[in-house]
Structures are given as C-alpha cells and as structure tokens.
A protein has these predicted regions:
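Conserved beta-sheet core of the metallophosphoesterase superfamily
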Residues: 169-213
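Beta-strand-turn-beta hairpins that frame and shape the catalytic cleft
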Residues: 15-27, 117-118, 125-137, 157-159
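N-terminal membrane-anchoring alpha-helices
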Residues: 1-18
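Short, flexible loop segments at the rims of nucleotide/cofactor-binding pockets, characterized by
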Residues: 34-39, 67-71, 139-144, 161-162, ...
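Membrane-embedded segments
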Residues: 5, 20-118
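Short beta-strand/loop segments at the ligand-binding rim of alpha/beta enzyme cores
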Residues: 152-164
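Short, Asp-centered acidic motifs that coordinate Mg2+ and/or phosphate
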Residues: 57, 92, 117-118, 134, ...
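Active-site metal-binding loops of divalent metal-dependent hydrolases
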Residues: 30-34, 62-64, 97-98, 123-124, ...
Length: 213
C-alpha cells in the first residue's frame, strides 16, 4: 500500500567496449500493475520521472495492469499516458504474466503499440544509437506466454551491444551461453517484502534466485 507510491530512480553507470564513445541513456521500468492500488495518476508520475532522464531508449519489462478482468478504467487512457514517454531512439516492451492473464492478451500489444512501443515477442531489433549498434532481444513471458529462448536469440552478434528484456529474472540462466551485455527484468518486486541484512520474506515463481538488482 505504501511502497508502490515511493518513486525512486536508480542510476547505474556502465562501460561497454562496443559503445562508440557517446554515452547512451537506457531507462527501464516494469510491473506498474495499474489498478486499485496503482492508479493512472501514479502512472503519470512515472512517465514524468522517465522523461526527466532524457532517455535514448526506454524498456518496459511487463505487467502493465494488475488484473485486466477487474479493471474498470479506460484502456485508452493508459495508452495515452504511456504515449507521453519520450525516447530519442525508441520504446520497447515485452509481455509479463499479467499481460496475458485476465484477458489482457487480447489488447496488450495493441495498447503498447498505440503508445509508441514496439513489443518484442521472442524476437529482436537492431538499431544505431549515437554511433553504437545495439541489438535488443525480447523474450515472451514464461509463465503464461510462449517463451522460447533459442528463437529470441537468433542472429546475436558479439560485435553489437546486446540488451535482453525478460519478465521473470530467473530465466537469465537460459541465456548465460549468449554474449548478453545487459539483462533487464521485472516480476520480483524486489522480493515483495524485503528485510535489510536478511533478505526477501516472499518470493514468486521464477523470481527466487534473482530477487533484486
């Protein structure tokens, strides 16, 4: 009831040999679970915070709504809010389990595309960002979707900066043989309830080994 409304930005400065020299800003957000406890007004605050980062790329790693079957708000309003996110070189997303459940599968991809996101479903996209060749690999949800790690990674190159989008973090074990430079995930909610120096009190399926990062 409290933590979803505590909006913080974690910044990580990383160096990769593939980067041509100009810094690249990538913003990831995930698990907004729009519904009774996280409203569209809360989502607007997330969008404002994202835009403050002046991102080159924005990545969403799934679970847009909490329960699509019970949501009585406007789907179009969510799309309109997400469309306000600015990214110089594009916005990309993958499915989470909540984006399949409750009937969300019927509209999630269309909603995200109308908001300017490209949804990656066991697929990839290669683009040039500030002189650096970046390949984005997006795996489908593994709990309810049609997850296929081998299909996702087709065509990967050691010469590119390779970014992976997955929803469930424990799936990373399926990608260890690939030259992934950065993996992004959601689903764990930081351990649901996390006690400092002790660890998570609650975990969820496919988010037990990698709870936070």
């Amino acid at each position: 009831y409290v933590e979803p409304h505590l909006l913080r930005v974690k910044q990580y400065d990383m160096k990769f040999e593939q980067v041509a020299g100009n810094p690249i800003t990538v913003v990831q957000f995930s698990d907004t679970h729009v519904g009774d406890f996280f409203t569209t007004e809360d989502l607007k605050k997330v969008v404002d915070k994202i835009n403050e980062q002046q991102a080159d790329l924005v990545l969403f790693t799934g679970d847009l709504m909490d329960n699509a079957a019970e949501y009585d708000g406007s789907i179009d309003e969510i799309a309109t809010i997400l469309s306000k996110i600015k990214a110089t070189n594009g916005k990309y997303a993958v499915f989470g389990n909540r984006d399949y459940g409750g009937g969300a599968e019927r509209f999630y991809e269309d909603l995200m595309e109308s908001a300017g996101f490209e949804v990656l479903v066991n697929s990839s996209r290669t683009l040039e960002v500030k002189g650096t060749t970046i390949s984005l690999f997006g795996a489908d949800d593994a709990l309810i979707g049609y997850y296929n790690s081998n299909k996702t990674m087709q065509g990967i190159s050691n010469d590119h900066l390779n970014l992976l989008l997955i929803h469930e973090p424990d799936l990373i074990s399926d990608f260890l043989s690939y030259p992934i430079d950065l993996a992004t995930a959601g689903h764990s909610h930081g351990g649901q309830v996390y006690i400092p120096f002790y660890g998570p009190l609650l975990t969820t399926a496919l988010a037990e080994d990698y709870v936070r990062g």
